[in-house]
């Protein structure tokens, strides 16, 4: 037998960016909304989520927003493009989606993109390790030591 409704209840995360159905359901029920994408995606989809929230009388700030982005350090534009191409091939993404979703470049370029993500209302970032370079631990260590501290409150 299932237990009665628990208080506090486990939080519900809804992932996806479907503008008519998924975001409407997230506006009604989610504690947390997650989608693959960067600043462009989160700004656009976030506006639509806000509209759905208004329709159901919910404060959109009640929903934690998070993004999934692919991390890669690169010293030049060619390196960034290699990371984007790898993402496109592996995930079947087009070039525009890759430019938005891939968090790649120098430390300052990655920080700049994260600042835009934060400005879009994102409060949490997921970095899938299965898409990291061969040196997964090195990339994560570098991210945590050189980038993350600037975004921690």
Q: Which functions belong to the PLM regions below?
A:
Residues 1-153:
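Active-site-adjacent structural elements that line small-molecule/cofactor binding pockets in enzymes
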């Amino acid at each position: 037998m299932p237990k009665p409704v628990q208080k506090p209840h486990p939080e519900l995360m809804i992932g996806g960016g479907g503008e008519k159905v998924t975001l409407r359901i997230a506006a009604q029920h989610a504690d947390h909304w997650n989608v693959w994408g960067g600043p462009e995606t989160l700004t656009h989809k976030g506006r639509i989520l806000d509209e759905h929230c208004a329709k159901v009388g919910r404060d959109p700030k009640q929903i934690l927003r998070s993004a999934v982005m692919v991390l890669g350090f690169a010293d030049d534009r060619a390196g960034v493009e290699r990371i984007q191409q790898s993402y496109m091939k592996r995930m079947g993404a087009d070039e525009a989606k890759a430019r938005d979703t891939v968090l790649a470049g120098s430390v300052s370029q990655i920080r700049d993109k994260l600042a835009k993500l934060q400005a879009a209302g994102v409060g949490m970032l997921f970095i899938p390790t299965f898409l990291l370079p061969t040196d997964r631990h090195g990339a994560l260590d570098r991210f945590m030591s050189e980038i993350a501290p600037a975004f921690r409150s």
